[in-house]
Amino acid sequence: MSNVTVIGTQWGDEGKGKIVDWLASRADIVVRFQGGHNAGHTLVVGDQIYKLSLLPSGLVRGKIGVIGNGVVVDPKALMTEIDRVTAQGLVVTPETLWIAENAPLILPVHGALDRAREAARGDHKIGTTGRGIGPAYEDKVARRAIRICDLAEPETLDWKLDELLLHHNTLLAGLGAETFTKEQLKDFLAEITPRLLPFSCQVWDRLDEARRAGRRILFEGAQAVMLDVDHGTYPFVTSSNTVAAVAASGSGVSPSSVGFVLGIAKAYTTRVGEGPFPTELHDQTGRTLGERGHEFGTVTGRPRRCGWFDAVLIRRAVRVGGVSGIALTKLDVLDGLDEISICVGYELDGQKIETFPSAPGAQTRVKPVYETMPGWKETTAGARSWAELPAQAIKYVRRIEELIEAPVTLLSTSPERDDTILMRDPFED
């Protein structure tokens, strides 16, 4: 029996929500280990539609949900989300939701700085959601973050707020934005502290006990490898590491506890916001993929850019992300296309290359080298076994496996939870 870690392998929005929900029904504990409330997904359970950004997906299946120390927590957003799902019938208590006491908080000053800096960038925006994720991670690394455990120590909180405001107010004033007083932040924290503190605990200790007891743990990643602050399309990335190794450091478990790493990838590629996108399609095919795939951001509502499957990027994600197998989603969106292209390499300044460059200028200059395959006219929507798939769709999946150097262990053929073909059980690996 193994634990399972789920990560995205593209630029997010790969359909992690459905896959995590599908796996969560077989797990005992579901853990968020990085990111904040800047990414979200939609889960459908019976006649209820849940939109989650911070809460672990397992809560909708009656499992224990964990927010690890690697997550930056906006307490206001968290309480709003808890109130919303509670009104829908979910039970969210300190027994069902554990939050790491050493998780850093996102305060109103972080969002204000995030938005002020993005506005000041003019034509060089990086596409931040303006929710304070980046500034909160900056504070963590600079050792001035307010952590949940600080709320229980008024004296500690007092001097840490002084240090935090000295930094942030200097930046805000320099950007011509409104500054904050200590009283404003104290009032904000005083309001949420009674609700937040009961959920806080030593998550690392509880997870270690669960592991020793043989309980199945599902680690739920946010964003994706190509948005990783080190390995993604920097600076058009998120502010945290998103690879599977962070499941350990972001929740306080040993590296060996990460288990089977399931990378999620769409059968094509999408991206929200700014940044390089070698296989982006600006034609009718791109628009068709967006319309069929309902490609709009869960959190931002922004339309996603669409393009062909990029095997070069996924192969990189497999290697740096530690991916054991791929869950390929939205295969049905490709139904009916005459031809389907896969990016198998790039051209950069007239030379062929087999890996994606790190320099921003080179990333924007690469041109995709495509391999084209015939499409299929039959439908794959709702298929639940290989026997139900068109022969050409199977060839497409097999070619992807060859190019990314990893097996497709799970195939999703519609947004419905049970429209899933399982080739290999990650929990039994």
UniProtKB/Swiss-Prot annotation:
Return the cofactor note field. Binds 1 Mg(2+) ion per subunit.
Question: Where on the tree of life does the source sit, at the highest rank?
Answer: Bacteria
Its predominant location is cytoplasm
Q: Where does Mg(2+) bind?
A: D13, G40
Q: Name one GO cellular component term.
A: cytoplasm
- Binding positions for GTP per the UniProt entry: 12-18, 40-42, 304, 330-332, 412-414
Where found?
Answer: Cytoplasm
What is the protein named? Adenylosuccinate synthetase
This chain is encoded by the gene named purA
